């Protein structure tokens, strides 16, 4: 065993690792989706209690979908999440098992309640987010924990944790100089299973960027905690720190255009506009009448009895000031009608357009005409409500929030 080399290499990495503790960006921004779960302790990565001796020391954690978990190689890595409620950093401590959410190639993260409330809020159960991989804000050296089991010098397992970046591989070198590469298990332990190892041994821990930190293991006895001589350094990267949370609706303002609009064609929960209608069945793909212009293949229609209406909403906050100025739409009816009210839930004003049997475009200033609330997301909803006498069939097309640049 080359103790001199062991100490010199490890001390070098220790000094490099102490130069800075701020996270480094380790990937470009990418689209993700997040849910939340409550059973956050004792996750698949083996950290047991999150605030215990093996855990990250806080509850800002996530369980990664199969594609991200990568057979436990994601354990201990960190991601910064940009959501509709804010930004937060999480460590991967578990694998997300839910079919449909977590077993697809899409990068899904199941968050702790703390992380979900920080980045998304408490009013929804799922949301789209923007994510990037970052180095972890851990302090101190890399650590190892010998499994609490009947370990021997021919079979032992240990977990390595408290690392700033991901681990690529581990090998052990015994006191006779024999080096053995170890496999990583799905439960995040590294296994030695072979000829009797001559203790003490050195665990050579290699990062995904090629750094090496060594951990001196004195015996195969289980439930022992060890500290390495060093910490991985942040790699030099050129990734831009320009992530933003996905805007929950179409940034060009379209609410209805041949269907209720989903931004960027993401057909995921909470993104885009949905049918929140009250007491009326809306045909969102009515092809029985020509649309307002040549690009219209279908329109929206519904027969409104008294005090029922077509309602359109979205779950996530839509803070419109500085982005949109007005609501515009085309409307007609099966007869002349003056009892329709256009309004938002929680708004201070409403409008009553006069309907005819031909398409008419209306544009209402969100502030002056509609007194729109600061957010057009839940609980606000756009309503086309019958406040007149008798029923009326209403047709709608090209519903849009007018962007500032277009006003």
Swiss-Prot record:
Residues 1-23 form the signal peptide. The lineage of its organism: Eukaryota, Amoebozoa, Evosea, Eumycetozoa, Dictyostelia. Disulfide bonds join 45-75, 78-136. InterPro entries: Expansin/allergen_DPBB_dom, Expansin_CBD_sf, Expansin_CellWall, Galactose-bd-like_sf, RlpA-like_sf. This is Expansin-like protein 2. One of its GO terms (cellular component) is extracellular region. It is found in: Secreted. Unlikely to encode with a protein with expansin activity. The keyword Signal applies. PROSITE patterns: EXPANSIN_EG45. Belongs to the expansin family. Expansin A subfamily. Keywords: Disulfide bond, Glycoprotein, Secreted, Signal. Its main location: secreted. PANTHER family: EXPANSIN-LIKE PROTEIN 2 (PTHR31836:SF26), PTHR31836. Residues 42-141 form the Expansin-like EG45 domain. It comes from Dictyostelium discoideum (Social amoeba). The gene is expl2. It comes from the Eukaryota. Glycans are attached at residues 70, 117, 387. SUPFAM superfamilies: Barwin-like endoglucanases (SSF50685), Galactose-binding domain-like (SSF49785).
């Amino acid at each position: 065993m080359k103790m001199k080399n062991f100490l010199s290499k490890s001390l070098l990495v220790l000094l490099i690792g102490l130069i800075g503790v701020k996270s480094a960006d380790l990937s470009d921004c990418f689209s993700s989706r997040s849910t939340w779960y409550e059973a956050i302790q004792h996750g698949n990565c083996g950290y047991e209690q999150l605030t215990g001796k093996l855990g990250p020391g806080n509850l800002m954690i996530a369980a990664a979908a199969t594609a991200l978990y990568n057979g436990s190689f994601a354990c201990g890595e960190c991601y910064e999440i940009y959501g509709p409620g804010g930004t937060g950093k999480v460590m991967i401590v578990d694998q997300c098992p839910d079919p449909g959410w977590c077993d697809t190639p899409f990068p899904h993260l199941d968050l702790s309640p703390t992380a979900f409330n920080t980045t998304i809020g408490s009013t929804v159960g799922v949301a789209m987010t923007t994510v990037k991989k970052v180095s972890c804000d851990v302090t101190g050296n890399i650590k190892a924990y010998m499994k609490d089991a009947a370990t021997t010098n021919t079979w032992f397992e240990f977990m390595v944790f408290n690392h700033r970046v991901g681990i690529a591989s581990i090998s052990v070198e015994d006191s006779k100089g024999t080096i053995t590469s170890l496999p990583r298990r799905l439960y995040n332990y590294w296994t030695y299973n072979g000829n009797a190892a001559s203790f003490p041994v050195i665990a050579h821990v290699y990062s995904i960027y090629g750094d090496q930190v060594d951990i001196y293991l004195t015996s195969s006895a289980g439930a022992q905690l060890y500290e390495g001589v060093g910490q991985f350094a942040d790699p030099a990267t050129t990734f831009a720190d320009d992530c933003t949370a996905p805007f929950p609706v179409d940034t060009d303002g379209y609410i209805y255009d041949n269907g209720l609009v989903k931004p960027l064609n993401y057909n995921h929960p909470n993104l885009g506009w949905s049918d929140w209608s009250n007491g009326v069945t809306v045909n969102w793909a009515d092809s029985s009448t020509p649309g307002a212009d040549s690009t219209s293949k279908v329109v929206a229609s519904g027969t409104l009895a008294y005090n029922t209406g077509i309602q359109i909403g979205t779950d996530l906050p839509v803070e419109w000031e500085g982005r949109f100025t007005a609501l515009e739409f085309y409307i007609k009816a099966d007869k002349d009608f003056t009892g329709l009210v256009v309004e938002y839930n929680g708004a201070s004003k409403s409008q009553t357009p006069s309907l005819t049997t031909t398409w008419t475009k209306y544009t209402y200033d969100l502030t002056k005409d509609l007194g729109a609330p600061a957010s057009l997301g839940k609980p606000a909803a756009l309503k086309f409500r019958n406040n007149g006498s008798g029923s009326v069939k209403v047709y709608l097309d090209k519903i849009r929030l007018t962007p500032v640049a277009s006003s």
